[in-house]
Amino acid sequence: MTGPPRLSSDLDALLRRVAGHDQAAFAEFYDHTKSRVYGLVMRVLRDTGYSEETTQEIYLEVWRNASEFDSAKGSALAWLLTMAHRRAVDRVRCEQAGNQREVRYGAANVDPASDVVADLAIAGDERRRVTECLKALTDTQRQCIELAYYGGLTYVEVSRRLAANLSTIKSRMRDALRSLRNCLDVS
């Protein structure tokens, strides 16, 4: 197959070939789905490192369990995105459990100079500041930032998604980041 799959049936066929351990089919399946999977995982985890690691785990699971895909129950993309969402949510739960353990065990050794409430308030304030600064951007700048940083897309993918020249996207991103830096008073 050449070019992106036109129908979900193209991905279904690729996934069936992956079930037979066809490496070329796996590479093609990965190429056609990686942005969607990474974007979904990034929206759930909001951490680049964890998102990359989780995405890698998802594709390892695809390689091992492609034979479990049943096209009668849904499309290959739906199967993959469901798997990705579940894996990302599991990662969040695992991290939360780890954080709760750290809180329980660390409570006895609290540094009196540390103020958890103040730290949380500062983090919330920073989030609000970023949100306000994003609102100050033009619609096109905000759209570029959201696709690249929250959607996990590369500049090339953003330019394709918005049907704009790559140089235009780079200019919008540069201007948007400069505006955000100025708005947030970051040097």
From Swiss-Prot:
Write out the residue ranges of the motif Interaction with polymerase core subunit RpoC. Answer: 53-56
Task: Name the segments for region: Sigma-70 factor domain-2.
Answer: 30-96
Annotated Gene Ontology MF terms?
DNA binding; sigma factor activity
Asked if the record carries the keyword Transcription regulation, the reply is yes
Show the Gene3D superfamilies listed in the entry. Answer: 1.10.1740.10, Winged helix-like DNA-binding domain superfamily/Winged helix DNA-binding domain
Looking up InterPro entries in the UniProt record yields:
RNA_pol_sigma-70-like, RNA_pol_sigma-70_dom, RNA_pol_sigma70_r2, RNA_pol_sigma70_r4, RNA_pol_sigma_r2, RNA_pol_sigma_r3/r4-like, WH-like_DNA-bd_sf
Q: What does this protein do?
A: Sigma factors are initiation factors that promote the attachment of RNA polymerase to specific initiation sites and are then released. Extracytoplasmic function (ECF) sigma factors are held in an inactive form by an anti-sigma factor until released by regulated intramembrane proteolysis. Sigma-K controls genes such as mpt70 and mpt83.
> Which family does the record assign?
Belongs to the sigma-70 factor family. ECF subfamily.
Quaternary structure and interacting proteins, as annotated:
Interacts transiently with the RNA polymerase catalytic core formed by RpoA, RpoB, RpoC and RpoZ (2 alpha, 1 beta, 1 beta' and 1 omega subunit) to form the RNA polymerase holoenzyme that can initiate transcription. Interacts (via sigma-70 factor domain 4) with anti-sigma-K factor RskA.
NCBIfam families per UniProt: PRK09646.1, sigma70-ECF
Misc note = Extracytoplasmic function (ECF) sigma factors are held in an inactive form by an anti-sigma factor until released by regulated intramembrane proteolysis (RIP). RIP occurs when an extracytoplasmic signal triggers a concerted proteolytic cascade to transmit information and elicit cellular responses. The membrane-spanning anti-sigma factor is first cut extracytoplasmically (site-1 protease, S1P), then within the membrane itself (site-2 protease, S2P, Rip1), while cytoplasmic proteases finish degrading the regulatory protein, liberating SigK.
Identification of the protein by name = ECF RNA polymerase sigma factor SigK
Tell me the organism: Mycobacterium tuberculosis (strain ATCC 25618 / H37Rv)
Lineage here is: Bacteria, Bacillati, Actinomycetota, Actinomycetes, Mycobacteriales
Q: Which gene encodes it?
A: sigK
